[in-house]
Regions:
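Alpha/beta-hydrolase superfamily serine-hydrolase fold, recognizing
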Residues: 2-310
Length: 310
């Protein structure tokens, strides 16, 4: 395991939130609930509205499957690149039961996508099905479905499908990890992805409380949780390169799960990178990407460049 906890962000600008957001993060601490999410959507939407308009094109609501939520936005450079670019597919959070690829118009997540286009990537900003209509393992299957669509079609947008990195936050990170690492879900016929970026996911559901959203996705039978937990059912290697990140003010369970997954993968011969993002909470760690705060973005961009080229 490569611990990035004390490293400065590569080529970083300001690596902390603005004062009024930092004050809110410290005031709330590791607590996370819908009210916290709503407060930070408002705070970051206000911040992102003033950003410069990036030089990108967006193909909106591209269908990658038959369901109404099988949609992605493809963010590409305004001017066609001279060569194919690596691809980052991003899967949002939402506690399994809510969430969308665009919040506050297209400010949150859309700005994240725009940021990584400026870093030399084609970005797919992906929406997937939700529980209870789509219980385990459908979130992971939607990640796989989106990846296969990109295999077949991203070259039409200037992307190289052989250089695909999957990134997910919270529930999205849970689904990405399950798709790529769970022995019962990994698609052995598909070429391995270039890398995974897992931000504050749940990797051991058996070691998790059972609030309504967990029960909606994983079911109410706790005896089934062990076989549904990625960390307890890791596929055999080799494993793709991984960046596993959490925030300083994440709820403790997310930090514990990230540490446990990184340790287990290291025991199995992998070398995941473990990043702890100072001064952020469970949602600000993602919502800030695209602002002047570069606590996470340069780390992800550098990881993608290392594993997928430029």
């Amino acid at each position: 395991m490569v611990d990035l906890a004390t490293r400065a962000a590569p080529e970083a600008g300001a690596a902390s939130p603005p004062d009024h957001i930092a004050d809110a993060i410290r005031r709330i601490g590791p607590r996370f609930d819908p009210a916290v999410r709503s407060e930070f959507i408002r705070l970051y939407a206000d911040l992102l509205r003033g950003r410069p308009q990036p030089a990108t094109r967006i193909a909106r609501d591209v269908a990658y499957g038959p369901d109404a939520r099988h949609l992605m936005d493809l963010h590409v450079p305004l001017h066609s690149p001279a060569k194919s670019l690596p691809v980052l597919a991003y899967f949002h959070g939402g506690g399994y039961v809510e969430g969308h690829k665009n919040l506050a118009g297209d400010l949150i997540y859309g700005c994240l996508a725009e940021y990584f286009v400026q870093s030399g990537l084609i970005v797919a900003n992906v929406t997937y099905r939700l529980a209870p209509q789509a219980p385990w393992p459908e979130g992971a299957r939607d990640v796989g479905r989106a990846a296969r669509w990109l295999d077949d079609h991203v070259a039409e947008f200037g992307g190289d499908p052989r250089r695909l990195v999957l990134m997910g936050h919270s529930a999205g990170g849970t689904h990405v990890a399950a798709c790529a690492l769970h022995a019962g879900l990994r698609d052995a016929k598909r070429p391995p992805v270039a890398g995974l970026v897992l931000v504050s996911g749940t990797f051991d559901v058996e070691d998790t409380e059972q609030p309504p959203n967990i029960a909606a996705y994983y079911g109410t039978d706790r005896s089934s949780y062990a076989r549904k937990s990625t960390i307890r059912n890791l596929a055999t290697g080799p494993y793709p390169p991984m960046l596993i990140a959490t925030a300083e003010f994440d709820p403790q369970r997310f930090r514990d799960h990230a540490d446990a997954l990184a340790r287990r993968l290291t025991e199995l011969g992998a070398a995941p990178e473990r990043l702890r993002i100072p001064g952020h909470n469970h949602v600000s760690e993602i919502y800030h990407v695209g602002t002047s705060d570069e606590s996470l973005g340069p780390h992800v961009a550098a990881f993608c460049k290392k594993v997928a080229g430029s």
